[in-house]
Amino acid sequence: MHISFSALPTKIKQLLALCALTIALPAQAQFRVEVTGVGLTQMPIAVATFRGEAQALQKIGAIVKADLERSGVFRSVDTAGAVLDESTRPDLAVWKQKSADSLVTGSVTPLADGRFDVRFRLWDTVRGQDLGGQNYAVTAGDLRLSAHRIADFVYEKLTGEKGIFSTRIAYVTKAGQRHTLWVADADGENAQSALASPEPIISPAWSPSGSQLAYVSFESRKPVIYSHDVASGKRKLIANFRGSNSAPAWSNDGRQIVATLSREGGSQLYVMDAGGGEPRRLTQSSSIDTEPAFSADGKTIFFVSDRGGAPQIYRMSAAGGNAERVTFNGNYNISPALSPDGKYMAYISRVGGAFKLQLMDLAGGTSAQITDTSADESPSFAPNSRLIVYATQQQGREALMTTTLDGKIKARLAGASGDIREPDWGPFSR
């Protein structure tokens, strides 16, 4: 590929040059959510402090509030520390006067077996209606998950669309010679190490069921593709053919994996059973074809190729065949990610000397830049298609960010220090 490798973002250096990672692990795998920006049509909502939450290890109300703010759909109304449980009907007129269209109340109660009873209720202050609620009996370790589920309930009730707060993200890091694959909540908290290795780990990709993660490991001194069972920690070898094995992408039904293999010389796209087996070649070019991504209907594969002289995004039938160029603005476009609703493609474009996150309307073919940072990488859509997670540099630090599709609301999932790379947003699964 005719590119200056010194100018490439980290992910493409890994995929095309198959070099060692050069990023640093955060001092700790905990994140702080920082939300910036204001949307034009945000819904004002008040989330009260849950009665009894001081007895728990998590502030349920604060987590629900942060989730809703990060979505870009809601604007929080100050509750002035009000503590309200779900069992008593609040004075909704007071909250309407505070400009809150909705109100969330709840409680957290310790149980005799060590678990916690978490209850909540959602109120419509404008119509004076009880919009319902739920209750969960959870362990201390699942208190955050219960808060995310509350936020999911609120989001779906008020927007008519499924919430994504109880979903998960995966990403990779490096500290010294230690490379780690992490799985975390959608807000970046509760990070758990899925795999650690002295050799690089790259390209994590969630299966459609959310039970598996495909990734590329260099532990055998060459890039090899594995599938990792998230619940059990067991893994299965998927592709270890001659040459490199990289950039795995799951088919929409989870039965197949498309990847870039160089078993016949050049780097081309191949499809194989998700459990491994003999691959079938999909592309027949003399160029580098990499970074495959399936369309929402599973009928089309988008990928990056330099067959036109510079890296651009193409698409072809999932069965293979002739490829059609998709990106035309600029001479460097990589990392396609398709929205689950089939409407958009996120990708990275080189603009001058910067790498910018772009969003393309697939129906019209028009693109818009939606970030103001200069080293964006690895976009991935939330399963409801309303947010994008990506890696970038901000204020001299590597970080994960989420953004709304219009770029107006961004949330930084920032560690204390160091680098975080290659996020992939998991499906609705829990």
Where are these regions (language model features)?
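Short loop/turn segments that connect beta-strands within beta-propeller blades
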Residues: 126, 185-189, 229-233, 273-277, ...
